[in-house]
């Protein structure tokens, strides 16, 4: 039985959306634009089209932003070659793509263990954290071996592609995305590289490539953090699948509207924010625990604890009684 994503991809292809003039080029430009937007770029798809196709510098946009997009385009063009050749994913190829991605925006680092440059795709020689107060990523001295093991495992899976369903192929690419950003091999550019690797695999196996829009950024980061804390890849797979379903529905609707047809496409249900879901559940049952809330919502207990702390600080929730045996009170605002 086909998954919802597989059915939607079938509908997308049935309509011939991917057979439109210059579709591949413009879709690639869209991928690049949204990947750099996640990192702070304000350049639009139309502006990238002008810059990429005509070599025109963009007024009002910083040189860093423009180089970020131009460099990522060069990296994607190289990844497309690897995809067409069914080349193995290797440490050297990942370093090559990282060097292209960071060519004009990377930095040099000087450490007690030696110098390295993110502009050259060098593996980091320093430890890094996920923001101030965040958890540290893997120790730098473990990265080379872990990255090699990651490539070997991924290549073993790639060789089984003929026995995998479309949904399984997508999940392999989503897992690769998550695992690479978790290893965090470079001092900078890990997010762009993880999304690029995901797309490389999708291009290789003839899938419609995934995009993560800037509007998805908050939930994207939350999904990465929750997956890392729970060690449950299912969380990130569900986020990526749901996000892709939303984008495909939107693309199909836009296409049908553009050719003057009604769009018989079921619109995605609006996602309920985690904090709103917590409030709703506590109204129904004030005796919910952190664990039962986590099970109901599908996030980690630590994630629930963070939301509860924020809601308490905002005066939305009160705790009545002890942690064990007490209950929650939702403060109704008149």
Where are these regions (language model features)?
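FIC/Doc superfamily catalytic core
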Residues: 1-188, 192-334
């Amino acid at each position: 039985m086909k998954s919802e994503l597989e059915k939607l991809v079938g509908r997308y292809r049935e309509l011939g959306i991917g057979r439109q003039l210059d579709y591949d080029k413009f879709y690639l430009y869209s991928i690049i634009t949204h990947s750099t937007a996640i990192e702070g770029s304000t350049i639009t798809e139309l502006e990238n089209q002008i810059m990429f196709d005509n070599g025109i510098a963009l007024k009002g946009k910083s040189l860093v932003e423009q180089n970020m997009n131009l460099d990522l385009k060069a990296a994607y063009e190289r990844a497309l070659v690897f995809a067409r050749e069914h080349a193995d994913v290797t440490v050297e190829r990942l370093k090559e793509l990282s060097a292209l991605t960071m060519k004009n925006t990377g930095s040099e680092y000087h450490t007690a263990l030696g110098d390295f440059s993110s502009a050259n795709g060098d593996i980091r020689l320093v430890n890094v954290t996920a923001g101030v107060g965040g958890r540290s990523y893997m120790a730098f001295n473990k990265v080379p071996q872990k990255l090699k093991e990651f490539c070997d495992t991924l290549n073993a899976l790639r060789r089984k592609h003929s026995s995998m369903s479309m949904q399984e192929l997508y999940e392999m690419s989503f897992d690769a995305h998550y695992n690479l950003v978790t290893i965090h091999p470079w001092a900078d550019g890990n997010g762009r590289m993880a999304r690029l690797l995901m797309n490389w695999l999708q291009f290789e196996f003839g899938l419609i490539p995934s995009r993560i829009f800037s509007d998805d950024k908050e939930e994207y980061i939350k999904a990465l953090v929750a997956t890392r804390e729970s060690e449950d890849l299912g969380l990130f797979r569900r986020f990526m699948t749901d996000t892709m379903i939303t984008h495909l529905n939107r693309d199909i609707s836009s296409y049908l509207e553009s050719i003057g047809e009604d769009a018989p496409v079921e619109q995605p249900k609006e996602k309920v924010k985690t904090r709103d879901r917590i409030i709703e559940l506590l109204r129904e049952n004030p005796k919910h625990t952190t664990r039962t809330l986590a099970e109901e919502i599908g996030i980690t207990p630590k994630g629930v604890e963070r939301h509860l702390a924020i809601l308490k600080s905002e005066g939305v929730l009160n705790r009545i009684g002890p942690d064990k045996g007490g209950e929650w009170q939702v403060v109704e605002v008149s």
